[in-house]
């Protein structure tokens, strides 16, 4: 600034700086500075200085008054805490005076200064305050006190996208919409010159209409002129961080806005797949996958992801040099994934979102998680002994969006001369402010009405769909009714036929009964004569045969009668079922008609609500256009209803039972149409009246503004004339006043333009009202025509009623006929039962008479019974032998039970021995008897011991035999396979050799022909016949070649099939072998347990020597451990949690059972060889940062060779190839660069190795998991000890296990550490069948070596 400028211009520039909200010395900033000074100086130690004490005594009271007048936290009511982070929390608040709802973010000043290198609160404030973008959360106010920074933002009631993804399976259509909105939001931030650096679903919030806005700009950073950023700290969330940001840790990080597009790719993948693409349980695992993204990025096979989506994800998740979006946002917008018919990039904000949140009130927090109260003590600034300036970094943070700044310096100087001008200006400003507020409120109302209109349209569409579905159901029901009536007629016809058959059968039965009665008479006569002669016996036999034949006939007839009865009952049941179906269908039809009428009523009510909402929006011309479209749609619906009525009436003629309901529908439709027309007329009249009122109100406002303007202009002109004559020095001031007037003129012109726009809208609305009136007249004419048609249809309905009555009478007659038939059937059944009783009596008499004739047969029967008894005895003997075999097979189970009983006996004996030692002084004789008893029990136990040892030896032999069989089978299989392969090779080589010989022969023949002299001499004189012969020969050769090729291809296909079959057999045999090995392992552990018990028994029962307790404990084998542990379910703790398994650790194996039943059946799900164990250790927070903090002390890790694993379900997993993780070799270590955001210490210098936001560059060995600072290697310091692990990491696997408590974890770790072999397991052959179930875990992270209680490293 030049010193030649006048004081007025200087003061004017100072005034502009004070009024500018972006200036560093505006009024709020100066007030913040005074407030901060008072806060920082008001301490007893500092007030000893006189200058400070004088300053405080001068300004402290005024600053306290200013604090009371400025915005503070007490101005808001806290509704609920909706979020909590590292620096503070987010509260849902309501302003006490305005009752408006906001989201207020609290940031702790102590935490900000403590982590000043990672706190970007200025960027967050500036972006939200000055963005003016619909894609960024708006900041209304920012203020502070001595402990917190406060940011009052707009409340987003839809929650974040994490909540949406947890509640819905996001389809690709939704993913396209939300990804497009994220792209536009990031473009808005990039256009302001910032990079977000922490794009994730947690920072994407949904407003009340379901649209997305970005939030949490605490990691944003300002770009330089080249659009790049320099940063040496890795900022962001591990799953979403880009490779170039990871590389910036500890080095010269230089990257641009493309790091945000990487996070967008991760977000899109997570929406479509359900998990992040580089998921791992440990931080090192995620970071190594991100750095090796070319090989680790894969898509699951079970997800239907389009090619365009995969292409977009791969274009985002690639190197920054070729990443999509590096050259601008337009190349992202042009991608094929975003092509659709629903929305365009320009109208994306106006389209209806896929999910619109259902809100009960303005403070609805159903889309946010309930948070527990923060009971931790808050850290505050300590009382200083010298000046620290803790409040100075936050000077200028205060911001008010609607702040009216101080008037200009010129205006303050002219107060004495222009009081009237000031009052006029204030009045004009108030009126303009009121008009702006009205405009803002009307725009908000417009937006709300548009949203309501959209929701009501959606509801209308749903209702129309439901009406169509109900109409289709009604048609289906009517067709079903007609089919049922046809079936009913057919059944009645069948019933008549069956009745005729029943009558015929009854006649036959009567004739047969008469014949039976005659036969009975003849039998009685023959019985009397049988006592006198043998001839009568022969006749008796003949009569018996005849009787039997008659009985057979009777049985057949009775069977036929029973069948007829069954068929009759079935027919009656079917008739009753059909009648019930008919009734149900009629009831359903009635219910459907009622539901249709209710739906129509709801439809008209919704229309009334719609029109009421449109009536409130009379000032908007767009909604009147919607009204016109709705009226035309209503006309089309009336036409559609008319066609429906005609169709329904045509169907009513066929379906006679639905006539009454159709009349009700017609009446309802007439009433609804009349009501609809009246309501439309009333609404139109109300809209016209409201337009007149608004027009009058606007004209009054316009006149008042014009009058105020004219008065102000006259007075200003007078004052200007007076001041020109009186003061020439005040020209600059007059110029300023003229500028203000011109500004007011511009405002007035804008308001006039708005008024003209409103009047034009009003005229348009009046024209549209006229058009609506014409359309109403047309609809009234159509209504008269419809009434006439309805009358004709009512006449036809009366005719159909008469026909329905006739049909009902016919149905009643059929029902009466049915009842008569049922009565006749009941009588026939009674007669049949009486005949059956008579037949039984006759059969009893026959049996009594036949008793004498069957005496001679009894001897034969006795002989047969004797033979049968012998056979039974033989069968019993066979069964006894089989039971003996079964007992032999169950000797193992009996041996186990015996061992348990012998343990109990041993305990009893020990108790008896203890009592005997006490009573030995009193009764020596008793002692001797008890010793003899004990000797007997010992001998008995020794016998059982010998039996058990024999059984164990037998089992061992069987086990060895099984192993030998398995080996021989494997060797035979390998030999067979090698022989087949050799045979195939030999056959192929023969074919190749034959083809080669044929080829050489043909070439030789051609050479001979070419080298012949005759051929050379007569080359020019060659005849056409020779050429034809050669062509024939060539064709023959080609045919032979083709035949040979076909044969060869057939042979290849055949051998390929055989190979596939052999491979399938190999897989089956491998699975069977795995199962057998697992069962053998479980059996071996059981045998081992039995041996331990036997040893205990043998030691306890040795009476001769009684060793001390210490000696016995020393001689016992190491006890095994078993119990419940949890294993990661499907390898993903975050998504699927833990799975409980029963684990048994024996001397050689670790067995995993799904439950105790599997343990009893000896079928483990997984077996690990203890010989293949590398390492056992407790985990740290960095290893399993996805697990709960309470679970981390209970988790431990097992590291083992992958050939030592045997699983029940073998899953062939693809081995990842080409993975090249960057690691540094140093003293046998393989160091991987990493970062620790959780507590960890360097094992070389014992200094902290972690930080929440800016961790130092670190290294971790992927073998022994030693952690150290990267500087130790860079500076070549000899502080790191050599690596103690010598196994190959690529051949190793790890497993996480969760114990029930921390003590259990320690117990398992100490026990397994003792089991680790001193010599590490050797490498394995990768072609072995067991490697089918292994998976590549080269990038798995394992942490530091845990020290054992004895001091040795585990």
From Swiss-Prot:
The record, for PROSITE patterns, names: AGC_KINASE_CTER (PS51285), PH_DOMAIN (PS50003), PROTEIN_KINASE_ATP (PS00107), PROTEIN_KINASE_DOM (PS50011), PROTEIN_KINASE_ST (PS00108), REM_1 (PS51860), RHO_BD (PS51859), ZF_DAG_PE_2 (PS50081)
- Keyword Zinc-finger on this protein? yes
Q: How is its activity regulated?
A: Activated by RHOA binding.
Q: Where are the zinc fingers (Phorbol-ester/DAG-type)?
A: 1228-1283
Domain Protein kinase residue range list = 76-338
What residues make up the catalytic site? 198 (proton acceptor)
The record's account of how the chain is modified after translation = Autophosphorylated on serine and threonine residues. Cleaved by caspase-3 during apoptosis. This leads to constitutive activation of the kinase and membrane blebbing.
Keywords carried by this UniProt record? Acetylation, Apoptosis, ATP-binding, Cell membrane, Cell projection, Coiled coil, Cytoplasm, Cytoskeleton, Golgi apparatus, Kinase, Magnesium, Membrane, Metal-binding, Nucleotide-binding, Phosphoprotein, Serine/threonine-protein kinase, Transferase, Zinc, Zinc-finger
Q: What class of enzyme is it?
A: transferase
State the residue spans of region: RHOA binding: 998-1010
Q: Name one GO molecular function term.
A: ATP binding
Residue numbers spanned by region SHROOM3 binding: 707-946
Q: What happens when the gene is disrupted?
A: Mice exhibit both EOB (eyes open at birth) and omphalocele phenotypes as a result of disorganization of actomyosin cables in the eyelid epithelium and defective actin assembly in the umbilical ring.
Q: Which residues form the REM-1 domain?
A: 479-556
Q: Which Pfam families does the UniProt entry name for this protein?
A: PH_MRCK, Pkinase, Rho_Binding
| Sites bearing Phosphoserine, chain numbering | 1105, 1108, 1328
Q: What is its EC number?
A: 2.7.11.1
Q: Which residues form a coiled coil?
A: 422-692, 1011-1102
Give the protein's cofactors.
Answer: Mg(2+)
Start and end of every AGC-kinase C-terminal domain?
341-409
**Region span, Auto-inhibitory:** 1115-1354
Which cellular component, as a GO term, is one annotated location? cytoskeleton
Catalyses which reaction(s): L-seryl-[protein] + ATP = O-phospho-L-seryl-[protein] + ADP + H(+); L-threonyl-[protein] + ATP = O-phospho-L-threonyl-[protein] + ADP + H(+)
Its biological purpose is as follows: Protein kinase which is a key regulator of the actin cytoskeleton and cell polarity. Involved in regulation of smooth muscle contraction, actin cytoskeleton organization, stress fiber and focal adhesion formation, neurite retraction, cell adhesion and motility via phosphorylation of DAPK3, GFAP, LIMK1, LIMK2, MYL9/MLC2, TPPP, PFN1 and PPP1R12A. Phosphorylates FHOD1 and acts synergistically with it to promote SRC-dependent non-apoptotic plasma membrane blebbing. Phosphorylates JIP3 and regulates the recruitment of JNK to JIP3 upon UVB-induced stress.
Q: What is known of its domains?
A: The C-terminal auto-inhibitory domain interferes with kinase activity. RHOA binding leads to a conformation change and activation of the kinase. Truncated ROCK1 is constitutively activated.
Q: What is this protein called?
A: Rho-associated protein kinase 1
Supply the source organism for this entry: Mus musculus (Mouse)
* Gene name of this polypeptide: Rock1
């Amino acid at each position: 600034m030049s010193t030649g400028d006048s004081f007025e211009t200087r003061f004017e520039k100072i005034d502009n700086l004070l009024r500018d909200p972006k200036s560093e010395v505006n009024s709020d900033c100066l007030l913040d500075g005074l407030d901060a000074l008072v806060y920082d100086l008001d301490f007893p130690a500092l007030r000893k200085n006189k200058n400070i004490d004088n300053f405080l005594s001068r300004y402290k009271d005024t600053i306290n008054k200013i604090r009371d007048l400025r915005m503070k936290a007490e101005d808001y009511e806290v509704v609920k805490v909706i979020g909590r982070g590292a620096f503070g929390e987010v509260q849902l608040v309501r302003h006490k005076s305005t009752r408006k709802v906001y989201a207020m973010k609290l940031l702790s000043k102590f935490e900000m200064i403590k982590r000043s290198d990672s706190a970007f609160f200025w960027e967050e404030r500036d972006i939200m305050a000055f963005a003016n973008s619909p894609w960024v959360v708006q900041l209304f106010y920012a203020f502070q006190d001595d402990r917190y920074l406060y940011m009052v933002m707009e409340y987003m009631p839809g929650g974040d996208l994490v909540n949406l993804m947890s509640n819905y399976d996001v389809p690709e259509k939704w993913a396209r919409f939300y990804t497009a909105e994220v792209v536009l939001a990031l473009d808005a931030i990039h256009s302001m010159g910032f990079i977000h650096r922490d794009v994730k679903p947690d920072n994407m919030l949904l407003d009340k209409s379901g649209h997305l806005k970005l939030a949490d700009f605490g990691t944003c950073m300002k770009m330089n002129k080249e659009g790049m950023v320099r940063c040496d700290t890795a900022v962001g969330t591990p799953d979403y961080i880009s490779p170039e940001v990871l590389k910036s840790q500890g080095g010269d990080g230089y990257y641009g806005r493309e790091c945000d597009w990487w996070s967008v790719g991760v977000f899109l993948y997570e929406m479509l797949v359900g998990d992040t693409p580089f998921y791992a349980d440990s931080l090192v695992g995620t970071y190594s996958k991100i750095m090796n993204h070319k090989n680790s990025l894969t898509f699951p096979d079970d997800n239907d992801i389009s090619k365009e989506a995969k292409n977009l994800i791969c274009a985002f998740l690639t190197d920054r040099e070729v990443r999509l979006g590096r050259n601008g946002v337009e190349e992202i917008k042009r991608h094929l994934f975003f092509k659709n018919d629903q929305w365009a990039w320009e109208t994306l904000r106006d389209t209806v979102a896929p999910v619109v949140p259902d809100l009960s009130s303005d403070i609805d927090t159903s889309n946010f998680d309930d948070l527990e109260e923060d009971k931790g003590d808050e850290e505050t600034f300590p009382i200083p002994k010298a000046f620290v300036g803790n409040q100075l970094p936050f000077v200028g943070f205060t911001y008010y969006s609607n702040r009216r700044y101080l008037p200009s310096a010129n205006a303050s100087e002219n107060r004495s001369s222009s009081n009237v001008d000031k009052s006029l200006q204030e009045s004009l400003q108030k009126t303009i402010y009121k008009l702006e507020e009205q405009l803002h409120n009307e725009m908000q109302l417009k937006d709300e009405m548009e949203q309501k209109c959209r929701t009501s349209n959606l509801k209308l569409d749903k209702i129309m769909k439901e009406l169509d579905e109900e109409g289709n159901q009604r048609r289906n029901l009517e067709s079903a009714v007609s089919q049922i009536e046809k079936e009913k007629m057919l059944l009645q016809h069948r019933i008549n036929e069956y009745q005729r058959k029943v009558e015929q059968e009854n006649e036959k039965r009567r004739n047969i009964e008469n014949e039976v009665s005659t036969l009975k008479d003849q039998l009685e006569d023959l019985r009397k004569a049988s006592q006198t002669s043998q001839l009568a016996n022969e006749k008796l036999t003949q009569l018996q045969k005849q009787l039997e034949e008659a009985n057979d006939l009777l049985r057949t007839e009775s069977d036929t009668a029973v069948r007829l009865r069954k068929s009759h009952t079935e027919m009656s049941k079917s008739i009753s079922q059909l009648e019930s179906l008919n009734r149900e269908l009629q009831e359903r039809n009635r219910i459907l008609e009622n539901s249709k009428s209710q739906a129509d009523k709801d439809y008209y009510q919704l229309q009334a609500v719609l029109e009421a909402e449109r009536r409130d929006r009379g000032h908007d011309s767009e909604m009147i256009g919607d009204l016109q479209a709705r009226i035309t749609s209503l006309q089309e619906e009336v036409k559609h209803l008319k066609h429906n009525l005609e169709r329904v009436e045509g169907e009513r003629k066929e379906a006679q039972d639905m006539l009454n309901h159709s009349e009700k529908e017609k009446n309802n439709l007439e009433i609804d149409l009349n009501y609809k027309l009246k309501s439309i007329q009333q609404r139109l009249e109300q809209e016209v009246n409201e337009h007149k009122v608004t027009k009058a109100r606007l004209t009054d406002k316009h006149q008042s503004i014009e009058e105020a303007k004219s008065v102000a202009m006259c007075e200003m002109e007078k004052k200007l004339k007076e001041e020109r004559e009186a003061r020439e020095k005040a020209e600059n001031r007059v110029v300023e006043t003229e500028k203000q007037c011109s500004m007011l003129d511009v405002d007035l012109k804008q308001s006039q333009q708005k008024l003209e726009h409103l009047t034009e809208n009003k005229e348009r609305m009046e024209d549209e009202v006229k058009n609506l009136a014409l359309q109403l007249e047309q609809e009234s004419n159509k209504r008269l025509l419809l009434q006439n048609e309805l009358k004709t249809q009512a006449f036809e309905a009366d005719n159909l009623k008469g026909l329905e009555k006739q049909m009902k009478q016919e149905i009643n007659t059929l029902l009466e006929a049915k009842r008569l038939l049922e009565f006749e059937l009941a009588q026939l059944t009674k007669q049949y039962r009486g005949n059956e009783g008579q037949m039984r009596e006759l059969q009893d008499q026959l049996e009594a008479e036949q008793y004498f004739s069957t005496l001679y047969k009894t001897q034969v029967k006795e002989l047969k019974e004797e033979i049968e008894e012998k056979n039974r005895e033989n069968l019993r003997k066979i069964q006894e032998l089989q039971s003996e075999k079964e007992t032999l097979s169950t000797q193992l189970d009996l041996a186990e039970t015996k061992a348990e009983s012998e343990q109990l006996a041993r305990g009893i004996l020990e108790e008896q021995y203890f009592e005997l030692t006490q009573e030995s002084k009193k009764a020596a004789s008793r002692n001797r008897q008890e010793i003899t008893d004990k000797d007997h029990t010992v001998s008995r136990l020794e016998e059982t011991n010998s039996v058990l040892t024999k059984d164990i030896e037998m089992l061992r032999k069987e086990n060895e035999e099984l192993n030998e069989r398995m080996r021989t089978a494997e060797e035979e299989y390998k030999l067979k396979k090698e022989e087949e392969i050799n045979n195939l090779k030999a056959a192929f080589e023969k074919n190749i050799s034959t083809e080669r010989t044929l080829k050489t022969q043909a070439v030789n023949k051609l050479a001979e022909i070419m080298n012949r002299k005759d051929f050379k001499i007569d080359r020019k004189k060659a005849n056409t016949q020779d050429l034809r012969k050669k062509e024939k020969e060539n064709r023959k050769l080609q045919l032979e070649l083709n035949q040979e090729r076909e044969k060869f291809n057939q042979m290849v296909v055949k051998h390929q099939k055989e190979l596939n079959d052999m491979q399938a057999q190999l897989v089956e045999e491998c699975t069977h072998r795995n199962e057998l090995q697992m069962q053998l392992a479980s059996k071996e552990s059981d045998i081992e347990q039995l041996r331990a018990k036997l040893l205990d028994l043998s030691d306890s029962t040795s009476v001769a020597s009684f060793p001390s307790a210490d000696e016995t404990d020393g001689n016992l084998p190491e006890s095994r451990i078993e119990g419940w542990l949890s294993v990661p379910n499907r390898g993903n703790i975050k998504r699927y949690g833990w799975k409980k398994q029963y684990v048994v650790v024996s001397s050689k194996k670790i067995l995993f059972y799904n439950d105790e039943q599997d343990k009893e059946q000896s079928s483990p799900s997984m077996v690990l060889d203890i010989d293949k164990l590398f390492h056992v250790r407790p985990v740290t927070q960095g290893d399993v940062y996805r697990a709960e903090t309470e679970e981390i002390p209970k988790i431990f890790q097992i590291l083992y060779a992958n050939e030592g694993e045997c699983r029940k379900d073998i899953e062939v997993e693809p081995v990842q190839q080409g993975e090249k993780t960057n690691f540094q070799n140093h003293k046998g270590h393989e160091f991987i660069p990493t970062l620790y955001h959780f507590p960890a210490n360097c094992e070389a210098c014992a200094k902290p190795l972690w930080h929440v936001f800016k961790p130092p560059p670190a290294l971790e060995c992927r073998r022994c998991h030693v952690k150290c600072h990267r500087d130790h290697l860079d500076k070549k310091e000899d502080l790191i000890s050599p690596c103690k692990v010598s196994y190959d990491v690529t051949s190793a696997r790890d497993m996480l296990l969760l114990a029930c408590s921390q003590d259990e974890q320690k117990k398992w770790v100490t026990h397994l550490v003792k089991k680790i072999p001193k010599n590490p397991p050797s490498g394995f052959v990768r072609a072995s069948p067991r490697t089918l179930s292994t998976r590549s875990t080269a990038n798995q992270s394992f942490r530091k070596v845990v020290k054992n209680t004895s001091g040795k490293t585990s």
